[in-house]
A protein has these predicted regions:
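Glycine/serine-rich anion-binding loops at beta->alpha junctions
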Residues: 40-77
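Extended polybasic, low-complexity segments that bind anionic RNA or targeting/receptor surfaces
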Residues: 1-32, 79-200
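A short, flexible low-complexity segment enriched in Lys/Arg and Gly/Pro that occurs
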Residues: 17-54
């Protein structure tokens, strides 16, 4: 069993605010704007004044596409160009990842393995490795040093597992994982990225 860096995996997390910010930022940055409403100038029809300005006793209107009318345009609606992006500094993201990893480590949800046991790029090879670890086949996050063709072939069709490199770790995936499996050779890259000794 490899020793985990206490600066990454044993932080005392007394305030979850940064983890929450990073989690929400991930969701916001994954969001795209598709909803769009029609303003009064974009709704078809309504070119004719519905009734004369004076003498009817009714309120004056210039178009049946006024936003307060049924079938009228929408005032202040979605334009389809909304920007939901939330920004966090690189340092804040890394600290949030370390806090999330520490929280998972406290719950004994992190396991270290020598390798995934992949020889022929078969899914059953990875399934066997995970079965030997006695982990529940649900929401497993696997951290590997590098992605190669065999690894991709062996893991792409496993619905309950997600494979990432250390520098692609994020708070959303960590917090949603029931088990995090880290390949031993990925630990040094993870240390270097999070502690900032070098850019991996």
């Amino acid at each position: 069993m490899a020793d985990l860096n206490p600066e990454i995996f044993n932080l005392e997390v007394t305030n979850h605010e940064l983890v929450k910010l990073a989690y929400d930022a991930y969701l916001a940055n994954s969001r795209s704007s598709h909803a769009k409403t029609l303003k009064r100038g974009e709704v078809r029809g309504g070119g004719k004044k519905p009734w004369k300005q004076k003498g009817t006793g009714r309120a004056r209107f210039g178009s049946t596409r006024n936003p307060i009318w049924r079938h009228g345009g929408v005032a202040g609606g979605r334009t389809g160009e909304e920007n939901f992006t939330k920004k966090l500094s690189k340092n804040a993201k890394r600290i949030a990842v370390m806090q999330a990893l520490s929280m998972k480590n406290t719950k004994k949800a992190i396991q270290i393995i020598d390798n995934l046991g992949i020889k022929d790029g078969k899914v059953k090879e990875v399934i066997k490795t995970l079965t030997d670890l006695k982990v529940t086949p649900k929401n497993i996050l696997i951290v590997i040093p590098e992605k190669d063709e065999l690894t991709l072939r062996a893991t792409n069709n496993i619905a309950f597992a997600k494979v990432v490199r250390p520098t692609f770790l994020n708070v959303f995936d960590i917090m949603n994982a029931d088990t995090i499996v880290i390949v031993k050779s990925a630990i040094s890259a993870l240390d270097n990225w999070l502690i900032g000794k070098e850019n991996v």
